[in-house]
């Protein structure tokens, strides 16, 4: 099949959406499908690089990394229409979605959309207020996605939200896959020791690992308040925060206010190639976010053999088994209690870590690619049946 993927976010950006798209692209090509990508360029020029079409753009000034195309990309759209894709798979609801919709209208291709982001998590920051903002969002999103044949939800959490919005399309839950081999590989002990030394982590310290983008919606400040409780009795526990983002400065200020300078370490952004080392350095993976839709870091941590202690959220369904490979919490005191009970229990850490690895096996990229390709075949078949039915009805009407 010919598959066109449209997205506002793509390489060189690094985030969960980009990871999902690149993994899908690789798996579809392995299956023999022809894949092309239409995205927003990282600068003000339009260009084509291999199978990727970049539409010139400018900074949005709305949110870091978000750019706005300022071209209708006529030549690129014309070329993609002439290519005649069987399926157009949009990955974002805003700028590139318009291109996707136009190409579907011009080609009759089947239209699939993956809903990656729970925007309602951000409505509390708008003047209208959370309740009114959510209602407006639901109405707008229902209209926006009206032309889509099937929506893919990465988790049950996302499916529930879309159903609350009143979406009428088929909604299929397909967890985003990760490359498990990358996290199965062992890292030399010498490399871990070197990293510990660089970060100022003693050999006897126990490490709580937080890894991901430092956005305000990630609620990392909650982990800091939890650490304030933990260090009252566990002075050898360190919180290692890996990643960069707009919340870093305020988090560093909070660390100083809570007098946690000796217990919290900011590693900054790290290259994708080095991420595995940080997972190996951690003893427990921690997360306070309730804005996740894919939970890729949960799966990466589990595949690396780490137990999970995370704020309770429906995104964790199937990834965190309470008491098996970790615990969920609903306040900082429960978080601190879970850490205190397990951080020095080597037997629990080992058993929970092994359980995490077993759970992660179901989230490989190969299975992800097969499930998505199955959706493509289904919507393409339905489209063909509907087209045939329409043609028959049209011919009958003409005879009359």
Regions found by a protein language model. Give the residues of each.
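N-terminal subdomain of nucleotide-sugar transferases
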Residues: 1-54, 367, 373, 377, ...
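Short alpha-helical donor nucleotide-sugar binding micro-motif in glycosyltransferases
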Residues: 144-145, 269-270, 277-282
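Nucleotide-activated donor-binding/catalytic signature segment of Leloir-type glycosyltransferases, i.e.
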Residues: 250-270
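Aromatic "clamp/platform" in nucleotide-sugar-dependent glycosyltransferases that forms part
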Residues: 290
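Conserved acidic donor-binding segment of nucleotide-sugar-dependent glycosyltransferases
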Residues: 322-333, 341-347
């Amino acid at each position: 099949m010919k598959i066109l993927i449209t997205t506002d976010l793509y390489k060189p950006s690094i985030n969960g959406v980009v990871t999902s798209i690149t993994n899908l692209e690789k798996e579809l090509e392995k299956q023999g499908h022809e894949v092309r990508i239409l995205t927003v360029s990282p600068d003000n020029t339009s260009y084509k690089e291999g199978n990727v079409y970049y539409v010139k753009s400018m900074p949005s000034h709305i949110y870091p990394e978000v750019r706005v195309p300022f071209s209708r990309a006529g030549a690129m759209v014309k070329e993609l229409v002439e290519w005649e894709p069987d399926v157009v798979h949009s990955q974002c609801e805003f700028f590139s979605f318009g291109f996707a919709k136009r190409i579907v209208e011009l080609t009759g291709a089947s239209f699939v959309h993956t809903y990656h982001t729970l925007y309602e998590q951000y409505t509390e920051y708008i003047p209208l207020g959370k309740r009114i903002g959510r209602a407006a969002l639901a109405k707008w999103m229902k209209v926006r996605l009206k032309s889509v044949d099937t929506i893919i939800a990465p988790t049950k959490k996302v499916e529930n939200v879309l159903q609350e919005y009143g979406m009428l399309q088929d909604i299929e839950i397909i967890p985003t896959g990760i490359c498990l081999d990358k996290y199965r590989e062992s890292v030399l002990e010498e490399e871990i020791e070197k990293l510990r030394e660089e970060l100022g982590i003693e050999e006897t310290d126990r490490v709580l690992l937080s890894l991901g983008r430092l956005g305000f919606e990630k609620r990392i400040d909650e982990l800091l308040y939890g650490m304030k409780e933990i260090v009252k009795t566990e002075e050898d526990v360190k919180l290692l925060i890996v990643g960069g983002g707009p919340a870093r400065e305020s988090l560093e200020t909070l660390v100083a206010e809570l007098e946690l300078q000796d217990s919290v370490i900011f590693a900054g952004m790290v290259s994708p190639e080095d991420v595995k080392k940080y997972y190996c350095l951690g003893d427990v993976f921690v997360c306070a976010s309730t804005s996740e839709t894919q939970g890729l870091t949960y799966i990466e941590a589990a595949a690396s053999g780490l137990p999970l202690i995370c704020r309770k959220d429906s995104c964790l369904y199937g990834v965190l088994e309470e008491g098996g490979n970790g615990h969920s919490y609903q306040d900082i005191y429960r978080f601190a209690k879970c850490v205190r009970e397990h951080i020095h229990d080597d037997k629990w850490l080992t058993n929970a870590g092994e359980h995490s690895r077993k759970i992660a096996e179901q989230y490989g990229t190969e299975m992800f690619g097969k499930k998505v390709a199955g959706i493509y075949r289904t919507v393409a078949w339905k489209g063909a049946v509907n087209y045939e039915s329409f043609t028959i009805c049209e011919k009958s009407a003409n005879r009359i």
